[in-house]
């Protein structure tokens, strides 16, 4: 009886306080506030992949004709890395660039005194004759002596893409062919219609950047074919990737120079026309933005095609101290999250990047969009907002994974607007993507106190001043797309679980069809 009374009393007590602990009420209160919240990335990224431990560096995508999926090898970056033996090759498998299966470590680093103590990026190809996968990669020597090669191209093979065997008799050295022995790396493989295999290697010759070419009929014996392409001026093209898409040949590469640090491309209707784009520093650019495909927050991009779509995988860097503004002449931290995008080929052969369909399809849960605060002259009509110069609208908190879409109609091609994140009603500073039509680019900037420009990406401004904007985020990684003309990858810490806003910096804009969804 005493026990029964005690239990009854306890249940009554719990019932009395259940209102205060009600998770629905807590959620309601949370949604009803718009002040800044110090959020943090969760342990796992589900779409812009990151391993449970460490980070993704220099992806090496390959379409597997046997398994009928994409295999994306990458350099595993531990923090901290061992002094001498670092960046083993790990891998993931994906059908669509939206979900990944970890393959774990595939090719380990060599020993401290071996040529591949540290591993650099490379490329994979399948040989249907011997039914082996071949991965050619860069072997980085630890503290090479003056008579040793700092970088050598090496190879490992596998019958099943699981168990790999290094060929300890294959060492392709640059100085054997008149190239630099310390810059001889990033091998890339492709096969032409005549059945010949081509290997391209980023290197230098007499101090100038070159892409060396080697050819083979069996992937075992290789012959030098001289220089495939020279590099413009004093620039150096990392992670070269050559492919044919429709009627055009392309070279996609990552510009190493600190002032650039972007993925770019050249094009030609034939391989010879492609090679001529940089010959004698010709600078025959493919478009009006020197072939820039994304911002400096998308690097080491390489492509693979399943015969229908061609995707590009690069990494979005982390930033020291989780500081969105910690961007110097070069990204302060190497490696980050794996980001997949889709190549869009336009009628004139130019390329831009778009979202893979499978990523777009992930966001199936529509969210209510609520105005939490307004500043300046804002006219609201249903879900359409007209913002005069200096006006802004703050919307309710985002989730962890977000798809944001809306259409902006500007009054002229001189108008300037932006999308801001980590912007609470009490925030002193926040981070924004500024769309500057008069300059033909989008900027990533810190707004509010201690405002500053961080970096930008150019794109073709619409002649009708209408911008169809879609933003995809997975925790702190987000990619903004505008009109199939702009791809703008960014790392924005704390954007999840915080309010966001639309702003008009110059002129007048009308924003319609604002939608947010999650998964």
Please describe what each predicted stretch is:
Residues 13-16:
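C-terminal motif of bacterial Sec signal peptides marking the signal peptidase cleavage site
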Residues 18-186, 190-234, 244-294, 316-376, ...:
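Beta-rich carbohydrate-recognition and catalytic domains
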Residues 242, 404-406, 465-482:
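Short tryptophan-centered beta-strand motifs in secreted/extracellular beta-sheet-rich domains
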Residues 338-340, 506-519:
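Exposed low-complexity, polar/acidic, P/S/T/G-rich flexible segments that act as propeptides
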Residues 350, 354-410:
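Surface beta-strand/loop "capping" patches
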Residues 383-444:
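Secretory/extracellular carbohydrate-interaction modules
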Residues 447-468:
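Short, aromatic/His-centered strand-loop micro-motif at the edge of beta-sheets
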Residues 489-510:
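Flexible glycan-contacting loops in extracellular carbohydrate-active proteins
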């Amino acid at each position: 009886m005493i026990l029964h009374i005690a239990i009854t009393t306890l249940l009554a007590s719990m019932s009395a306080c259940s209102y205060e602990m009600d998770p629905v009420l807590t959620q309601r209160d949370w949604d009803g506030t718009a002040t800044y919240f110090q959020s943090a990335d969760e342990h796992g990224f589900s779409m812009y992949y990151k391993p449970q431990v460490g980070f993704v560096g220099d992806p090496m995508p390959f379409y597997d004709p046997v398994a009928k999926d994409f295999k994306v090898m990458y350099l595993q970056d531990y923090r901290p890395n061992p002094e001498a033996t670092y960046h083993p090759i790990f891998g993931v498998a994906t059908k669509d660039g939206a979900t990944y299966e970890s393959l774990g470590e595939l090719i380990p680093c060599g020993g401290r005194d071996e040529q591949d103590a540290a591993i650099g990026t490379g490329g994979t190809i399948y040989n249907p004759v011997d039914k082996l996968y071949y991965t050619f990669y860069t072997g980085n020597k630890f503290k090479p002596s003056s008579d040793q090669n700092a970088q050598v191209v090496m190879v490992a093979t596998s019958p099943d893409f699981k168990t790999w065997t290094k060929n300890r008799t294959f060492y392709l050295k640059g100085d054997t062919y008149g190239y630099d022995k310390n810059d001889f790396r990033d091998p890339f493989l492709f096969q032409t219609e005549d059945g010949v295999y081509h290997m391209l290697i980023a290197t230098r010759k007499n101090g100038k950047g070159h892409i060396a070419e080697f050819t083979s009929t069996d992937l075992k014996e290789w012959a030098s074919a001289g220089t495939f392409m020279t590099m413009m001026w004093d620039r150096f093209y990392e992670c070269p990737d050559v492919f044919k898409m429709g009627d055009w040949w392309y070279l996609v590469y990552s510009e190493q120079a600190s002032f650039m640090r972007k993925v770019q491309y050249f094009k030609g209707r034939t391989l010879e026309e492609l090679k001529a784009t940089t010959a004698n520093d010709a600078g025959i650019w493919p478009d009006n933005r020197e072939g820039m495909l994304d911002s400096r927050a998308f690097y080491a991009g390489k492509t693979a095609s399943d015969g229908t779509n061609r995707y590009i995988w690069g990494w979005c860097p982390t930033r020291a101290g989780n500081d969105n503004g910690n961007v110097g002449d070069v990204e302060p931290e190497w490696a980050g999250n794996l980001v997949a995008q889709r190549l869009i080929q336009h009628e004139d052969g130019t390329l831009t990047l778009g979202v893979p369909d499978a990523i777009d399809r992930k966001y199936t849960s529509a969210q209510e969009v609520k105005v939490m605060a307004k500043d300046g002259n804002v006219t609201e009509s249903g879900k359409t907002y007209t913002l005069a110069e200096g006006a802004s609208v703050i919307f309710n908190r985002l989730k962890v994974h977000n798809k944001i879409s809306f259409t902006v109609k500007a009054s002229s091609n001189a108008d300037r607007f932006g999308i801001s994140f980590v912007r609470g009603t009490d925030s002193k500073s926040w981070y924004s993507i500024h769309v500057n039509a008069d300059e033909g680019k989008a900027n990533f900037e810190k707004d509010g106190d201690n405002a500053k420009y961080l970096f930008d990406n150019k794109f073709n401004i619409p002649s009708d001043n209408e911008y169809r904007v879609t933003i995809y985020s997975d925790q702190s990684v987000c990619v903004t797309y505008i009109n199939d003309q702009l791809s703008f990858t960014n790392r924005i810490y704390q954007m999840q679980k915080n309010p966001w806003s639309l702003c008009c910096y110059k002129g007048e804009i009308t924003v319609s069809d604002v939608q947010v969804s999650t998964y």
